[in-house]
Amino acid sequence: MSKPLILVTNDDGISAPGIRSLIAVMQEIGTVVVVAPDSPQSAMGHAITINSTLHLNKISAENAAVTEYSCSGTPVDCVKLAVNEILKQKPDLCVSGVNHGSNSSINVIYSGTMSAAVEAGIEGIPAIGFSLLDYDWNADFETFKPYIKKIALEVLQKGLPDSVVLNVNFPKRKEEDLKGIKICRQAKAMWEEKFDKRKTPQGKDYYWLTGEFVNHDKGEDTDEWALQNGYISVVPVQFDMTAHHAIQALNNWDLNK
């Protein structure tokens, strides 16, 4: 029986510790091809490159166990190039991450990590985005390798519903403090942005984005609650953004009179 073909990408860049851990786990499962940004692309969302050239650089040796490419574009560019130019086929699974920092709640909208997974889902590829609630470059990814493998194998064996990808977030906890895996909904939270106004040496104004993450949702079925209480959160994310519950109300508007 042939091994599954697995595409690995991220938004922190191809040299980030998180993706190196993810590659190691995927090697235990299947044949791995890596296409990841050549520099950090955090918070790029679903951006694609249309007004400049894209460059791929094969960085793995010909006989290497894992085929690796760095890409000058965004995480979504990486997935598009991988499927259409490198693999020339759909892989059995696409995994993105492991991100340095949480992508729970509203962060899923801004996340390059999750946008890469969503792009794979749009292409009809089962996909998972993994993130760790720890921004330290030397964060402990080893603790979560067994959970990454478990979730990836479940997706490979059972598949995912149409137009759905998984958003998996790990709490910053030691192994003995983890309470398990919890299927959740996305918490209703947001960033309250502020801009730090500064001046260049030439006296021109510029701005530095700051802010505070505010969780207005106290539900115990949310990803934020799960992470704060020692659970690994798994949220099924859909990329059909239609607000189906609002269609009937809008049909009652007098738009055709």
Swiss-Prot record:
Keywords of this entry: Cytoplasm, Hydrolase, Metal-binding, Nucleotide-binding
> Which free-text remark accompanies the cofactor?
Binds 1 divalent metal cation per subunit.
The task this protein performs is described as: Nucleotidase that shows phosphatase activity on nucleoside 5'-monophosphates.
* Gene this protein is translated from: surE
Reactions the enzyme catalyzes = a ribonucleoside 5'-phosphate + H2O = a ribonucleoside + phosphate
User: What's this protein's name?
Assistant: 5'-nucleotidase SurE
Stored PANTHER family? 5'-NUCLEOTIDASE SURE (PTHR30457), PHOSPHATASE, PUTATIVE (AFU_ORTHOLOGUE AFUA_4G01070)-RELATED (PTHR30457:SF0)
Q: Does the keyword Cytoplasm apply?
A: yes
User: Which Gene3D superfamilies did the record assign?
Assistant: Survival protein SurE-like phosphatase/nucleotidase
> In the UniProt record, which is one GO cellular component term?
cytoplasm
Q: Where in the cell is it found?
A: Cytoplasm
UniProt GO molecular function? 5'-nucleotidase activity; metal ion binding; nucleotide binding
What InterPro entries does the database record attribute to this sequence? Answer: SurE, SurE-like_Pase/nucleotidase, SurE-like_sf
Q: What is the lineage of its organism?
A: Bacteria, Pseudomonadati, Bacteroidota, Flavobacteriia, Flavobacteriales
The text of the family note is: Belongs to the SurE nucleotidase family.
Q: Which residues bind a divalent metal cation?
A: 11-12, 42, 99
Question: What cofactor does this one take?
Answer: a divalent metal cation
EC top class, as a word: hydrolase
